[in-house]
Amino acid sequence: PETIIGIGTGSTVNFFIDELKKYKNLFKGAVSSSNASTKLLNDSGIQTYNLNEVLEIEFYIDGADEVSKDNYLIKGGGGAHTREKIVASAANYFICIVDSSKLVNQLGAFPLPIEVIPESRSLVSRKIVSMGGIPLYRSGFLTDQGNEIIDVKNLDISDPMNLEMELNNIPG
């Protein structure tokens, strides 16, 4: 088998990897979105690859923190947001595993995690406040890339695509 799959991060994915190891002979290996998932995959006997080593990722499998009725997601609560986005964007298909507890009418009950370069945390936080958000620095936590996480409450997420664009335009 030549298929490479992408694997996300978090408690749901940990359960998935535990089941996936039974089928490890049906695919070549996986690209992971975090060091923790890479370790779990390797411990399960599943070959892992760096994204730069593969030409194609067939499926990206991950969980979500919230899912709206319109299938918009809040992801990144596990702190691997940047790599999750990168690996997911490289895949042909995205498979999101959630249970009914993650389904919401309106996104925003779960804080929106935003990964920031450490030097820009204060600037990004001020911009978020100007948008109506309440940023909370996730103290003592660094991503695998050495970045920090700001968990944001109180943002209007009625237009998730526009909000994502606004947030992505904040330097840092």
Language-model segments: what does each one mean?
Residues P1-E66:
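N-terminal active-site beta-alpha-beta segment that forms phosphate/nucleotide-binding
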Residues K39-G172:
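Conserved phosphate- and dinucleotide-binding cores of soluble alpha/beta proteins
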